[in-house]
């Protein structure tokens, strides 16, 4: 067992029965020329987030945590995105951007596209699990819940983009399914102004989970920390 210093209080978990979840670290969300950038969102400060996720993934893997990578998007025809009868059709900024700029049709969040791919710096390894997801929440229409329950995993540590959209949505759904969710705040990035990041983290630490950071997480997983706890 390890104890992680977090807000609003420390949380204790078994790394080997926990998962680190990397949410949507795709070119779409973290690279200039990707969907968020083309839709008018600022992605200029995502590079430190990528580096921090690399650090967190390395520490988590060494401690025996399961690593789960999400990729948000749909088939090339966007059938999975839903038609006019779906609220996703009306609220997805990727779909709205393509309707406004038809030349982008088939390029944003389409499986197999550059936009859909994970950023070059983040590469899943054997033993990791990579899951596509068609909506903001990683629990919707994916096998995430069964994957976690079959392994006895109850604690989820979240990283990725966007804090206020897919990260928060997945953590909230996990909360309703009795999972303990922790966000590493410096391994996440918001879609929108800085207040969106602050609001998401406030919601999480106040109502749905815990908030920590990468350095604290790595220190908690270090062999020295395990020795102190033992």
Swiss-Prot record:
Keywords: Hydrolase. Its EC number is 3.5.1.110. Gene3D superfamilies: Isochorismatase-like. It comes from the Bacteria. One of its GO terms (biological process) is uracil catabolic process. It is an enzyme of class 3 (hydrolase). Induction: Up-regulated by the nitrogen regulatory protein C (NtrC also called GlnG) and repressed by RutR. It catalyses: (Z)-3-ureidoacrylate + H2O + H(+) = (Z)-3-aminoacrylate + NH4(+) + CO2; (Z)-3-ureidoacrylate + H2O = (Z)-3-aminoacrylate + carbamate + H(+); (Z)-2-methylureidoacrylate + H2O + H(+) = (Z)-2-methylaminoacrylate + NH4(+) + CO2. Signal peptide: none annotated. Hydrolyzes ureidoacrylate to form aminoacrylate and carbamate. The carbamate hydrolyzes spontaneously, thereby releasing one of the nitrogen atoms of the pyrimidine ring as ammonia and one of its carbon atoms as CO2. Belongs to the isochorismatase family. RutB subfamily. This is Ureidoacrylate amidohydrolase RutB. The gene is rutB.
